[in-house]
């Protein structure tokens, strides 16, 4: 009798994606983050669904509805903090996943990579509109500052901002539409994830050496299912530790104050996972220039495959490129730190230097060093 998983139309798709999928035999734990992102997405959709059952997207009741969830709903506090810290875990996994792609040259699968960049932008948009929903001080002022950046667009800027706001300031209409966006975007992310996987399974996975592994494949199940379960347990352990022991560690205390248009917080800053981009935005004294730099800091990922000058795909055997890669990571950590600091000396100059280094590393140094390494191959 033929196995049902190989004959049933639906089971066949799942089988080819998660069970009989031929996988390189040497992929490391850096390849775990894809499945962890899937797990994060499922957790966020489920916790978000339960939160939406009790939340009211109205300026007069939004803040108190979140307080009600935490105080009166059974395990409401737990669901709320799982959702908030789940977003942080989501971004940790995202950045690790992108870092893996950069290090091992996975960006050479261009369709998969471009869908991935689109996914990153969608997740960032979802996180931004979600942060506005509790209607605390940082929610309100974060929404005001970030949406206001669109006014830097010549001619249509102001009209565009007022169109997004649904009025002349961030108000009831803004909150309602942001809730609608926050509800729909995760399902768009789920659809994009399916396309991401579709393109990946057209080519098969990359591996740490960057060398084709067609002659050395093993089935995904049981080898990588068990490996992914171990990764998932680690993720859940960290998430639970964060949620139960330090739920507000990554949040902003200002968000426990209800939104007040008449009182600006001393330091307006986004959640930690946006700080690097925020630092790049602030490092340019011109509004339009800052907005362009902010956009480019993310969209630069699209150009990575075009900047590949090395004859080797992976950085595994390229020590000089490795050095630059880890310099880039250190630079991003510096930018993250700067983004959370006030705009004063010496943070301004450090942020500007770190921003210049970020673009210089990706656009100039890495391609140049790759060419030098090509020359060294002939020695």
UniProtKB/Swiss-Prot annotation:
Keywords: Electron transport, Heme, Iron, Membrane, Metal-binding, Mitochondrion, Mitochondrion inner membrane, Respiratory chain, Transmembrane, Transmembrane helix, Transport, Ubiquinone
Cofactor requirements of the protein: heme b
Cofactor note: Binds 2 heme b groups non-covalently.
An example Gene Ontology CC term for this record: mitochondrial inner membrane
TM stretches of this protein: 33-53, 77-98, 113-133, 178-198, 226-246, 288-308, 320-340, 347-367
Keyword Secreted: no
Binding-site residues for a ubiquinone, renumbered to this chain: 201
Topology of the protein relative to the lipid bilayer: Multi-pass membrane protein
Xref: Pfam families: Cytochrom_B_C, Cytochrome_B
UniProt: heme b b562 binding residues: 83, 182
Main location: mitochondrion
Residues that hold heme b b566 according to the record: 97, 196
Annotated InterPro entries: Cyt_b/b6_C, Cyt_b/b6_C_sf, Cyt_b/b6_N, Cytb/b6-like_sf, Cytochrome_b, Cytochrome_b_C_euk/bac, Cytochrome_b_N_euk/bac, Di-haem_cyt_TM
GO terms of molecular function: metal ion binding; ubiquinol-cytochrome-c reductase activity
Record SUPFAM superfamilies: a domain/subunit of cytochrome bc1 complex (Ubiquinol-cytochrome c reductase), Transmembrane di-heme cytochromes
Localization, UniProt: Mitochondrion inner membrane
Source taxon at top rank: Eukaryota
Entry's Gene Ontology BP terms: mitochondrial electron transport, ubiquinol to cytochrome c
Listed PANTHER family: CYTOCHROME B
Further details from the record: Heme 1 (or BL or b562) is low-potential and absorbs at about 562 nm, and heme 2 (or BH or b566) is high-potential and absorbs at about 566 nm.
General function of this protein: Component of the ubiquinol-cytochrome c reductase complex (complex III or cytochrome b-c1 complex) that is part of the mitochondrial respiratory chain. The b-c1 complex mediates electron transfer from ubiquinol to cytochrome c. Contributes to the generation of a proton gradient across the mitochondrial membrane that is then used for ATP synthesis.
Quaternary data: The cytochrome bc1 complex contains 11 subunits: 3 respiratory subunits (MT-CYB, CYC1 and UQCRFS1), 2 core proteins (UQCRC1 and UQCRC2) and 6 low-molecular weight proteins (UQCRH/QCR6, UQCRB/QCR7, UQCRQ/QCR8, UQCR10/QCR9, UQCR11/QCR10 and a cleavage product of UQCRFS1). This cytochrome bc1 complex then forms a dimer.
Family of the protein in this entry: Belongs to the cytochrome b family.
Name of protein: Cytochrome b
Organism of provenance: Cephalorhynchus hectori (Hector's dolphin)
């Amino acid at each position: 009798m033929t196995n049902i998983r190989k004959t049933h139309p639906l089971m066949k798709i799942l089988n080819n994606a998660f069970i009989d999928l031929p996988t390189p035999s040497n992929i490391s734990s850096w390849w775990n983050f894809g499945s962890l992102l899937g797990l994060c997405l499922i957790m966020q959709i489920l916790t978000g669904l339960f939160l939406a059952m009790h939340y009211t997207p109205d300026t007069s009741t939004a803040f108190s509805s979140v307080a009600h969830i935490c105080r009166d709903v059974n395990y409401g506090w737990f669901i709320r903090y799982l959702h908030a810290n789940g977003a942080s875990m989501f971004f940790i996994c995202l950045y690790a996943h992108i870092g893996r792609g950069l290090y091992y040259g996975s960006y050479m699968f261009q369709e998969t990579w471009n869908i991935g960049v689109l996914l990153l932008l969608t997740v960032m948009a979802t996180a931004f509109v979600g942060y506005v929903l509790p209607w605390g001080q940082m929610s309100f002022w974060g929404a005001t500052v970030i949406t206001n950046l669109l006014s830097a667009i010549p001619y249509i800027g102001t009209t565009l901002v007022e169109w997004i706001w649904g009025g002349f300031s961030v108000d009831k209409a803004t909150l309602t539409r942001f809730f609608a966006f926050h509800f729909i975007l995760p399902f768009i992310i789920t659809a994009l994830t399916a396309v991401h996987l579709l393109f990946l399974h057209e080519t098969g996975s990359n591996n740490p050496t960057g060398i084709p592994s067609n002659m050395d494949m093993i089935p995904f199940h049981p080898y990588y299912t068990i490996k992914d379960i171990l990764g998932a347990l680690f993720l859940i352990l960290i998430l639970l530790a964060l949620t139960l022991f330090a739920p507000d560690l990554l949040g902003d205390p200002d968000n426990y104050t209800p939104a007040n248009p008449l009182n600006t917080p001393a330091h307006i800053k986004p959640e930690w996972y946006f700080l690097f981009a925020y630092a790049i935005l602030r490092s340019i004294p011109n509004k339009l220039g800052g907005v362009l730099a902010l956009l480019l800091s993310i969209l630069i990922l699209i150009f990575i495959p075009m900047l590949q000058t090395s004859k080797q795909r992976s950085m595994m055997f390229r020590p000089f490129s490795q050095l630059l890669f880890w310099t880039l990571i250190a630079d991003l950590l510096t930018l993250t730190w700067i983004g959370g600091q006030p705009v004063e000396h010496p943070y301004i100059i450090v942020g500007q230097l770190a921003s210049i280094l970020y673009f210089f590393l990706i656009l100039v140094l890495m391609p140049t060093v790759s060419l030098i390494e090509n020359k060294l191959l002939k020695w």
